[in-house]
UniProtKB/Swiss-Prot annotation:
Annotated protein name in UniProt: Nucleotide-binding protein BceJ2315_08000
Top-level lineage group: Bacteria
Role of this protein: Displays ATPase and GTPase activities.
Chain residues that bind ATP: 8-15
Keywords annotated in UniProt: ATP-binding, GTP-binding, Nucleotide-binding
UniProt binding sites for GTP: 57-60
GO molecular function, a single term: ATP binding
Length: 302
């Protein structure tokens, strides 16, 4: 059975992810107490169910300590994948404010003063981060701070499309001026490379557009940077596998996240498609949803 566990911070999009999995044919359960999970998996497997998705959050805090052991136990018999959703505190506060929902750990929030409300909400968010932190190492982390709901649904679809449970590598382009990704395991700064932004004809384009590709592809220093990063990854990916890592996020950053980082993330993703399951995501580039997050196959390899 394929089991997808969705966990992370409240307000980061767990309900959106669960709905996307339900649309994909998964039997979905929200806020399941962790200790019930093995029994539920056995029952559904006997009943012929082949896909199960479960959302687990800090409301199950009394049982969260059991999760690492449960994940290992379930992985002996099932294809278990863990998706850990995260977001910046600022983004979470804005979402709770817009939806007028109360954080599940907030207790009684005072509405007498905005400062008191935000302080209580911030404390609840930080407390939840502490509670679910041990689960982050088991899952593929995704920073949803800048993701719209439809983009997250597309990303979840790509996540479940990988064909096996081998190491998944996500190349994530981003712009430093919008902050570094919360989900990065490795980060490479490519701001030292020539910037297409200063060519007025290239400025409105992205690293997915042919004129920008031609501009960067013609520069030896760009290929040197790509070759060096690729060599580093090829050397160390086997060690990540030996450490039983299932997921690795490689962030590639330039100034705005539109030209250089996009081109380099795409190029590296295509090169590594034969070595691992690869997803490429463009956090800050103004591209459509399908282009912003996609699974890379060997046919994409140049």
């Amino acid at each position: 059975m394929r089991i997808v566990l969705i966990t992370g911070i409240s307000g980061s999009g767990k309900s959106v992810a669960l709905n996307a999995l339900e649309d994909a044919g998964y039997y979905c359960v929200d806020n399941l107490p962790p200790h019930v999970l093995p029994e539920l998996a056995r029952y559904l497997a006997q009943d012929g169910q082949r896909r199960l998705a479960v959302a687990i959050d800090a409301r199950s805090s009394a049982s969260l300590d059991e999760m690492p052991g449960l994940i290992r136990e379930l992985s002996r018999e099932h294809d278990v994948r863990v998706l850990f959703l995260n977001a910046s505190t600022q983004a979470l506060i804005q979402r709770f404010s817009e939806t007028r929902r109360r954080h599940p750990l907030s207790g009684s929030l005072s509405h007498d003063a905005d400062v008191g409300l935000l302080s209580s909400l911030e404390e609840a968010i930080e407390r939840e981060r502490e509670l679910v932190a041990p689960l982050a190492e088991f899952g593929h982390q995704i920073d949803t701070s800048t993701l719209r709901a439809n983009a997250l649904r597309t990303w979840v679809k790509r996540f479940i499309e990988q064909k096996n449970n081998d190491l998944m590598v996500m190349f994530e382009s981003f712009g430093f001026k919008r902050g570094v990704p919360l989900d990065a395991d490795l980060m490479f700064d490519v701001r030292a490379l020539p910037n297409p932004y200063y060519d007025h004809q290239l400025r409105p384009l992205t690293g997915l557009d042919q004129p920008v590709i031609a501009f960067l592809d013609a520069l030896p220093i760009v290929h040197q940077m790509i070759d060096d990063i690729h060599a580093f990854l090829m050397k160390w990916l086997p060690h990540f596998r030996d450490d039983n890592r299932s997921y690795l996020t490689v962030a590639i950053g330039c100034t705005g996240g539109q030209h250089r980082s996009v081109f380099i993330a795409e190029t590296l993703a295509a090169r590594l498609a034969r070595e691992a399951n690869v997803i490429v995501r463009h956090r800050d580039a103004p591209v459509d949803v399908d282009a912003s997050s996609r699974l890379v196959s060997e046919v994409d390899r140049p």
